[in-house]
Design a protein with these regions (language model features):
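Long, charge-dense
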Residues: 133-134, 222, 227-257
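Bateman/CBS regulatory modules and CBS-like beta-alpha motifs in cytosolic regions of diverse proteins
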Residues: 66-98, 110, 142-195, 200, ...
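Short, ordered loop/turn segments at secondary-structure junctions
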Residues: 10-12, 46-49, 112-114, 121-124, ...
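Short hydrophobic alpha-helical runs that function as membrane-insertion/retention elements
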Residues: 42, 65-67, 107-108, 189-191, ...
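Short beta->alpha transition motifs characteristic of CBS
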Residues: 104, 108, 114-130, 237, ...
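Short glycine/serine/threonine-rich phosphate/pyrophosphate-binding segments
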Residues: 15-21, 198-200, 218-219
Length: 315
């Protein structure tokens, strides 16, 4: 599209104006092919076609030139960054890995190709600051698949289907007698290789226990866990690392911005969006097409590389 050149006549075009645009665009395209310029010349018109011109076009079996009522640069004339969208259930860790790898600060969340929200580096940083809510993992409806992937673990009892929907996340740092006082049914307990602690958590109806340091889990504990409907995840990391990582398994939908999103359409004029972009603190702005499908992202920097439409005026 950057190589498009529009050949256009005056407003309220007559037959001469229309035929001039068609013939000159044809000539330029022929010369462009021979000279290997790569430019594409498109005949256009700045008004509606009268009856005389319609008759001439029909007689010579020519299509009417493209109607153009405004040649101001549009969003489609900007280099739109094709940032791939992610699913709302993707973990914060995976979203961060994508942003770090692509060197970007925001990602669009899509549902059926439509924009559902935006997750930014700031949102991920905010998720790390809420350290006093030990139920946030269940409030976010975190999937067990995300949990296992985030802590590089293995589910050795139970399956990956389902979500951690209720309960606290606790670390079994005390002896079993004290554990009985703070573990509640449906909790998730992070612990080590102590048999007594594992057994206590299961008997207290924990929903899941996370065994750290890749410790071996005995057959007795596995059997007890199956009988109580308790999942067992084994992670190679130490307790501190698991405790830090596990919150990064939460889905991005819990932290993404969904309200007051500033989006632009591919047909919007650059003049109209510049002022909006200047007043908003957002780094990136999502672009959608006429069907509302997500196309990509632009930033203020993209406006610096704007290439205006090229015209040839004829009559």
């Amino acid at each position: 599209k950057k190589n498009n050149v529009y050949v256009i006549g005056h407003k309220n075009p007559d037959t001469d104006s229309i035929c001039s645009a068609i013939s000159y665009a044809y000539l330029k395209n022929e010369l462009s092919q021979k000279q290997e310029e790569g430019a594409k010349y498109i005949p256009t018109r700045a008004g509606h076609i009268n009856e005389e011109t319609q008759y001439v076009l029909k007689y010579f079996e020519q299509e009417a030139p493209l109607y153009v009522n405004d040649i101001r640069p549009q969003v489609t004339d900007i280099e739109i960054r094709k940032t791939a969208g992610i699913e709302a259930g993707l973990s914060l860790k995976k979203a961060w890995d994508i942003m770090r790898g692509a060197r970007i600060v925001s990602l669009p969340i899509l549902e059926d190709e439509k924009l559902a929200g935006i997750i930014t580096v700031s949102d991920i940083a905010y998720s790390d600051m809420d350290v006093y809510d030990n139920m946030i993992l269940s409030k976010a409806g975190t999937s067990y698949k995300n949990i296992v992937e985030t802590i590089d673990g293995e589910m050795i009892v139970g399956d990956l289907d389902g979500e951690f929907e209720e309960g606290h996340v606790l670390i079994a740092a005390a002896n079993p007698d004290m554990m009985e006082g703070y573990i509640e049914p449906q909790d998730m307990v992070i612990l080590g290789n102590r048999y007594e602690s594992q057994l206590c958590a299961i008997e207290m109806d924990a929903q899941c226990i996370v065994v750290c340091m890749g410790a071996t889990v005995s057959k007795t504990i596995r059997k007890m866990a199956k009988e109580h409907g308790c999942r067992i995840i084994v992670s190679p990391y130490d307790t501190y690392t698991v405790a830090r990582l596990i919150n990064h398994s939460m889905p991005v939908r819990y932290f993404m911005t969904t309200d007051n999103l500033i989006t632009f359409h591919t047909t919007d004029y650059v003049d109209d969006i510049q002022e909006i972009m200047a007043k908003r603190r957002f780094r990136d702005f999502p672009i959608t097409d006429n069907q509302g499908n997500y196309v990509g992202m632009i930033s203020r920097r993209n406006l610096l590389d704007l290439e205006r439409k090229k015209l040839i005026l004829v009559d």
